[in-house]
Amino acid sequence: QLLALRMRMRGIQCYILAPIKGHEFRRACNKIGGEFIKIVPGSPHCINVMEIRHTLSPEMELIDEIDYVEMGSMLARKIQQLMTFFGLLIPDMSNEEEQMLDEALIRTYADFGITHDNDSIYTDMSSAPPKMKQMPILGDLHKHLQENPMTQRLAAIISRFVTGSAQSFNRQTNVDLSNKY
């Protein structure tokens, strides 16, 4: 807690993942204006694992003279993160299943108009900050996996997070992830 508080005082974003006794952090979190998020099945809180988040702030882009268009595809980076996530969830995934999952992810994002063009994640680039498109959720990916006979096993494993006991993960993000603590 002390380390997190020190980081907060320096303006460094800090997350504390406490699966066993997380409730012990609630009071400290609330005292400094933090966001206490309880991620469990049935929780009202949700972080959409499929959400593409713009990682650089406009201020940092100006300071570092980085153009987000030159950073590479945000979609490709997100798909890499999701492949890691699903690799942990399904450790015995075959190479063929990985390829099919990759293709299903690309199709799922395409359904929402999201491509490798970084501008495609925004609905309005003229506003500050730019307004982002609605992102797909696990249920959208699940539909694509169910359609392909070669990804039925993946669909069955993921169904727990779509219609099963952990279906609270099948929603849009409803917490403030930009909060520093």
Predicted features along the sequence, with ranges:
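Short hydrophobic alpha-helical runs that function as membrane-insertion/retention elements
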Residues: 14-17, 35-39
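P-loop NTPase motor domains
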Residues: 22, 26-35, 41-43, 50-181
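P-loop NTPase nucleotide-binding module
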Residues: 1-19, 23
